[in-house]
Amino acid sequence: PTSGGGWNWEYLRAVNFYLSHSVRCDDVDAREHFDGIARFFRAYFYFEKVKRFGEVPWFDRELSSTDPELFRPRDSRDFIMDKILDDLTYAINNISDKKDLYNVTHWTALALKSRICLFEGTYRKYHGIPGYEKFLDECATASKLFIDNAPYAIYKTGAQPYRDLFSSMNAIEEEVILARDYDRAQNVM
């Protein structure tokens, strides 16, 4: 399609462009941290594509608009999902675990891994596709790590905590894993 429909790959190109040029950074810790964030977003990008289209081509390097790779066939769902897990594992192992409401952290990557693995495991199970156990096991492992170690808790303050959680003008830091802040005066997120 020429517009809409979710077939836009600009975002992936930006991520792959960053990853192909990040090797220039001499600070290895910073590079690995930001490479982890880039790979988190690539995993999320591909998760959205797989949910919408199923099998799609996997690109993990920067391509030009004339690259013949752009016209190759789709990769298998197994291949794509394994690559998504590779990206998330890298992200989990390299992104800072310092709690930060407005930036991707180790905990954000762990939560995304849990969500993606739950989706893929149940999709495979209820569509009769083999291999669902791997994804459900990965989901359980990631979820257990998150529940046991993440610096988050269920918001229980106030007379109606569930309502207050969603009606507050500020993000409730104890429960929110990743947020976007909206500034009404400037009309920006």
Where are each of the predicted segments found?
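An aromatic- and glycine-enriched ligand-binding surface/loop that stacks and positions planar moieties
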Residues: 1, 81, 85, 89-90, ...
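Conserved, well-structured interaction surfaces
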Residues: 1-53, 69-82, 87-101
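Active-site-proximal beta-strand/loop segments in catalytic clefts of secreted hydrolases
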Residues: 22, 61, 180-182
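Aromatic-lined, polymer-binding surfaces characteristic
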Residues: 46, 55, 59, 100-111
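Proline-centered turn/helix-capping motifs that create local helix->coil transitions or kinks
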Residues: 49-58, 154, 186
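Short coil/linker segments at helix-helix boundaries
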Residues: 55-77, 123-138
